[in-house]
A protein has these predicted regions:
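Long, C-terminal-biased catalytic regions of enzyme "large/alpha" subunits
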Residues: 1-123
Length: 123
């Protein structure tokens, strides 16, 4: 049985692995190696297929967001801006703030330390 995707409109179409890979590649342009993009898209396709014969486009988008968030914050923001339909800078600011909080919690403050280190040459 092949995987199908239920779109927001209610239409159902076959899952397109190439479309998934292309979306990830666009978001990760110059950020992730093509082998990594291929591996991520294959991993997500397999995980989505394990959910059953049908997934929603929202499930696909959220899966991509979650994986990119783990891999590369810039690729995540690029994908998020399109997927969530950012309309202004405030949308980006909110997303960056949330991402920084999450990264700081995950790193136990690692990303915050970078901003508090002294700037300039060390003696």
């Amino acid at each position: 049985m092949s995987l199908v995707v239920r779109k927001r409109s209610g239409d159902v179409e076959p899952f397109d692995h190439a479309k998934l890979a292309a979306g990830i590649a666009r978001a990760a342009s110059a950020r992730l190696e093509s082998d990594t993009v291929d591996a991520v898209s294959a991993e997500l396709a397999e995980a989505l297929g394990m959910r059953g014969a049908e997934v929603t486009s929202e499930e696909v988008g959220v899966a991509v967001l979650e994986r990119l968030r783990e891999l590369d914050p810039i690729a995540y923001l690029r994908f998020s801006s399109v997927y969530k339909g950012f309309e202004d800078l405030a949308d980006f600011e909110r997303e960056v703030d949330e991402l920084q909080r999450d990264l700081a919690q995950r790193d136990l403050g690692g990303s915050l330390q970078k901003t508090t280190e002294p700037k300039g040459p060390r003696n």
